[in-house]
């Protein structure tokens, strides 16, 4: 597959139009807005950048790389192990249901689009529940997208969803959101680099320590007025 074909596949996977429901989640951002921790463009950008560098880069992003390697090697047992491990690290019911719903939607799409070899689709279908990183890495391997490229798209898509949530809930203007997203480019690249370092370590250096995110997510479950499901 040529680099251009890989780029098109990557754009497809990272598209906001991918029908997996990412737009309906804020991952604690709405609760941070409700309690006043996020209240303008600067605080929203700080929240998203810190989440990328100190949460995503330490757990989900390196795990994403490990899953990509497992799919590429055809190691179904290790795929299941990492999928179950990631699900167990979701601290609240909202965060757990988020990754399960999006993972299920993407795995169903992979089956309907017939992406990848039958054995990949069968392995994915056998996982229940399936988490989003597991399904997304399966799609990348099926479409021959390289690991770091796929992770960069995954992290950018996450940041894009966070900016969209901030625009709706703070609220912010569309241009302010685009300025914010542009300034987050370097944070996305730094996240990929840190995730690579952690995934390459022996054993892999994964950290799920994010107490404020867990508390805000738990608070969001009983928040009086909500736009988002997390």
Swiss-Prot record:
The keyword Ion transport does not apply. The keyword Metal-binding does not apply. Gene3D superfamilies: Urease accessory protein UreF. Keywords: Chaperone, Cytoplasm, Nickel insertion. It holds the Pfam family UreF. GO terms for cellular component: cytoplasm. It is found in: Cytoplasm. InterPro entries: UreF, UreF_sf. It comes from the Bacteria. One of its GO terms (molecular function) is nickel cation binding. HAMAP family: UreF. UreD, UreF and UreG form a complex that acts as a GTP-hydrolysis-dependent molecular chaperone, activating the urease apoprotein by helping to assemble the nickel containing metallocenter of UreC. The UreE protein probably delivers the nickel. PANTHER family: UREASE ACCESSORY PROTEIN F. Belongs to the UreF family. Required for maturation of urease via the functional incorporation of the urease nickel metallocenter. This is Urease accessory protein UreF. It comes from Cupriavidus necator (strain ATCC 17699 / DSM 428 / KCTC 22496 / NCIMB 10442 / H16 / Stanier 337) (Ralstonia eutropha). The lineage of its organism: Bacteria, Pseudomonadati, Pseudomonadota, Betaproteobacteria, Burkholderiales. The gene is ureF.
């Amino acid at each position: 597959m040529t680099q251009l074909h890989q780029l098109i596949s990557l754009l497809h996977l990272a598209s906001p139009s991918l029908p997996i429901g990412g737009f309906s989640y804020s991952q604690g951002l709405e609760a941070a807005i409700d309690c006043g921790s996020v209240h303008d463009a600067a605080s929203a950008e700080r929240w998203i950048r810190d989440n990328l560098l100190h949460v995503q880069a330490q757990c989900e992003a390196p795990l994403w790389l490990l899953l990509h390697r497992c799919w590429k090697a055809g190691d179904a047992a290790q795929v299941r192990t990492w999928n179950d491990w990631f699900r167990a690290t979701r601290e609240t019911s909202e965060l757990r249901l988020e990754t399960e719903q999006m993972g299920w939607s993407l795995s169903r799409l992979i089956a309907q689009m017939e992406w990848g070899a039958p054995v990949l689709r069968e392995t994915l279908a056998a996982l229940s529940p399936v988490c989003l990183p597991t399904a997304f890495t399966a799609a990348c391997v099926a479409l021959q997208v390289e690991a770091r490229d796929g992770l960069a798209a995954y992290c950018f898509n996450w940041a894009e969803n966070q900016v969209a949530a901030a625009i709706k809930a703070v609220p912010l203007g569309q241009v302010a959101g685009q300025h914010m997203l542009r300034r987050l480019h370097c944070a996305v690249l730094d996240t990929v680099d840190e995730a690579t370092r952690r995934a390459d370590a022996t054993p892999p250096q994964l950290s799920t320590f994010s107490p404020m995110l867990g508390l805000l997510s738990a608070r969001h479950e009983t928040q009086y007025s909500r736009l988002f499901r997390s």
